[in-house]
Amino acid sequence: MRNNTLKIYDMLSRGGFIAADSLDSTTRHLFDDIEENYEDYADYYREIGLRLEAGNGYYFFSRINEGKQIIEQKLDSFSKWLDYLDFLKCYDQTFTAGFQFRKSHIIEQISVDLELKEKAGRLFKKYDSSSNQDIVTKLIQEMMTIGFAECINETDETYKVTSAFRYAEELVNMIQIANEDEIPE
């Protein structure tokens, strides 16, 4: 067993990501350790039913032999990220790994862009979030919880999108490619 097995498990088992470009030195160290010892970690986690997956600058877990119900739950859970991604790309088409943004700028853009305002209103309907600030705060919290963004300046609330965000983009691209490949009736 490698030294960081438990730390890696704790971060990834909750649906998070370990990104190469994280601001957190511990996370970057874990990324480097996984990269150097990928086979050892992959073999270990495989024994407990987890698949250590590598993306473009990030790592995550998937389960081996997931049942249909679990896959459906994951798809349902990911459907909200389709809306989030749509909103973020509407805010700025260059919103991807490495992008930096300020919370206040997104809030300002919502107030001047009708399409963005409509998309924002649909993001957290079940919470009845009426203020743009609440909506943006919840979105940023979700991005930070999963590891898609990190705060780089607490004073002016500036954030950086991590390479783990590519996971969401890649899933959406796979869905779009699958739809394009379908033969119309």
What is the predicted function of each stretch?
Residues 1-73:
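Eukaryotic partner-binding/assembly regions in large regulatory complexes
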Residues 7-21, 84-87, 96, 100, ...:
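Leucine-rich, amphipathic alpha-helical/linker segments
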Residues 33-41, 128-145:
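Short amphipathic alpha-helical interaction segments
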Residues 46-54, 144-154:
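A short, conserved structural fragment
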Residues 53-108:
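Short basic alpha-helical hairpin corresponding to helix-turn-helix/winged-helix-like nucleic-acid-binding
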Residues 58-62, 156-162:
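Minor-groove-contacting beta-hairpin "wing" of winged helix-turn-helix DNA-binding domains
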Residues 73, 157, 164-185:
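Short, amphipathic alpha-helical interaction segments positioned at domain boundaries
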Residues 112-134:
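Short, positively charged loop/turn segments that connect secondary-structure elements
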